[in-house]
């Protein structure tokens, strides 16, 4: 009986402490403009537009300004829009805004020991490990893998060009980016045939996990309920377990291959030189007890999720935009072909990144119109602060409104038109594709190399056309990344 009383008292105490903390945050944030909420704040309104959440935030930005407040259940949220505001928060006041907002349902998955949702010194150590493999020198070494994957993709597209029938490209572009990250992590890649074999391969599992991980969670919006319920679906945990098992097998395979490589002094998987991946340094962290084996699995999953869907979706949107703007596609193709030296059959990012000016402009415009992380990853204020005269309470969730920063007339003329020439002035401060601050995208150098290389190979070698008279749909939907609708194109080889 005493135990029951103790449990009851503890629960009541937790409840009142939570309510008191929420009241404090609401009181401090109350002067910030934003949509009025009734039952459950703005949760119901947001739930109705969940696939177009970015459009709702654009609407609210136009109405309430660059700093506005949203109540999502019991979750106090402030949304920041525009580079000047984002800079003030995430650069000028970085100590206050650096922390990642930690969703309650992530605790049961990795105890906040992954790459995405960790904080403090633990995250700083992980970041230093990851960034040590993202230097210009390391990215240059990755070029051969990116070029190899681009070649495999072009060989596949050659088959479709010969057939001359419309087909959907999304899945191929997603696997292109998945394979590069798998090579980056584990030194492996997978054939494009695995997209259609209906198996439970890692490719299939990653794609299923991407769909499930973005599903809404009750405990995110009502954290007080987390001790009493686990609102992740059984399917989510089953897929997460499958993905974890694939990661474990890849890690063991990599360790065995590395051992064999050291014994035989041969490269892994037939590479021309010894393969070094980020996994080597992460394994050292495990050996030194700075991260656990379970954390290693979570970190690998985070890198996969962060690096695959984003690039794949970006390339899909790039093709859609250039099919809908045929004259821009032709200009880009000519610029690529004319800029490459005679005898160069394939694009080299380190050689041509500054040598094909129109390609650079087109990539910037793709990043602007179709930012992968449309609302970024949520942050949390570590103390009370003030931005543009608005007081924001400690513990408030902070959203970087990247989509509105890129798609509002407040920052760009004709924001919904695809105009690469707008970037000739090179005002990069307006673009926040990779987020702002010390926790911006760690893989942006690799992503840029992937996107530049893929677009140079695709548009330098193929002409993409729309088999329909209706323009391709470029209205993305909200998910882990801005999702491009499936689209059909016809392609033909350029001479």
Curated annotation (Swiss-Prot):
Transmembrane region(s): 1-21
EC number: 1.14.-.-
InterPro entries: Cyt_P450, Cyt_P450_E_grp-I, Cyt_P450_sf
Cofactor (UniProt): heme
Membrane disposition: Single-pass membrane protein
SUPFAM superfamilies xref list: Cytochrome P450
Keywords, comma-separated and alphabetical: Heme, Iron, Membrane, Metal-binding, Monooxygenase, Oxidoreductase, Transmembrane, Transmembrane helix
Disulfide cross-links: none
Entry binding sites for heme: 441
Matches recorded under Gene3D superfamilies: Cytochrome P450
GO CC list: membrane
Subcellular location: Membrane
GO MF entry, a single one: heme binding
PANTHER family linked: CYTOCHROME P450 513C1-RELATED, HEME-BINDING MONOOXYGENASE FAMILY
Family statement: Belongs to the cytochrome P450 family.
Identification of the protein by name: Probable cytochrome P450 513C1
Organism of provenance: Dictyostelium discoideum
């Amino acid at each position: 009986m005493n135990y029951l009383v103790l449990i009851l008292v503890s629960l009541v105490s937790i409840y009142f402490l939570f309510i008191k903390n929420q009241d404090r945050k609401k009181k401090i944030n109350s002067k910030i403009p934003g949509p009025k909420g009734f039952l459950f704040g703005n949760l119901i309104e947001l739930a109705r537009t969940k696939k177009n959440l970015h459009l709702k935030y654009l609407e609210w930005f136009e109405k309430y300004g660059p700093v506005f407040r949203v109540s999502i259940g019991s979750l106090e949220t402030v949304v920041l829009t525009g580079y000047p505001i984002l800079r003030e928060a995430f650069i000028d006041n970085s100590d206050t805004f650096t922390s990642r907002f930690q969703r309650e349902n992530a605790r049961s998955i990795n105890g906040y020991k992954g790459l995405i949702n960790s904080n403090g010194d633990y995250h700083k150590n992980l970041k230093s490990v990851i960034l040590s493999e993202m230097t210009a020198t390391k990215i240059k070494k990755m070029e051969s893998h990116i070029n190899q994957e681009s070649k495999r993709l072009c060989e596949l597209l050659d088959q479709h060009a010969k057939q001359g029938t419309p087909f959907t490209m999304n899945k191929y572009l997603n696997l292109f980016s998945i394979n590069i990250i798998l090579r980056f992590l584990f030194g492996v890649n997978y054939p494009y045939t695995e997209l259609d074999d209906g198996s439970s391969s890692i490719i299939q599992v990653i794609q299923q996990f991407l769909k499930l991980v973005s599903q809404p969670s009750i405990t995110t919006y009502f954290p007080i309920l987390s001790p009493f319920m686990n609102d992740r679906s059984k399917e989510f945990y089953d897929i997460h377990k499958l993905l974890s098992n694939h990661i474990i097998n890849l890690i063991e395979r990599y360790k065995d291959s590395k051992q064999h490589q050291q014994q035989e002094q041969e490269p892994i998987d037939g590479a021309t030189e010894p393969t070094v991946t980020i996994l080597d340094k992460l394994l050292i962290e495990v050996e030194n007890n700075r991260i656990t084996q379970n954390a290693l699995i979570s970190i690998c999953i985070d890198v996969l999720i962060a690096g695959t869907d984003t690039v794949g979706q970006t390339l899909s949107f790039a093709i859609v935009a250039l099919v809908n703007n045929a004259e821009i596609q032709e200009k880009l193709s000519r610029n690529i072909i004319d800029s490459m030296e005679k005898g160069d059959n394939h694009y080299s990012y380190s050689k041509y990144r500054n040598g094909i000016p129109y390609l650079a402009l087109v990539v910037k415009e793709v990043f602007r119109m179709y930012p992968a992380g449309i609302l970024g990853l949520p942050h949390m204020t570590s103390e009370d602060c003030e931005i543009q005269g608005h007081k924001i309470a400690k513990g408030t969730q902070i959203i970087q409104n990247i989509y509105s920063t890129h798609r509002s007339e407040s920052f760009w003329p004709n924001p919904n038109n695809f105009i690469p020439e707008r970037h000739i002035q090179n005002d990069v401060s307006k673009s926040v594709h990779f987020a702002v601050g010390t926790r911006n995208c760690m893989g942006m150098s690799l992503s840029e190399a992937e996107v530049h290389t893929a677009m140079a190979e695709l548009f330098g070698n193929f002409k993409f056309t729309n088999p329909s008279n209706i323009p391709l749909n470029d209205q993305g939907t909200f998910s882990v990344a801005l999702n491009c609708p499936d689209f059909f194109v016809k392609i033909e080889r350029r001479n």
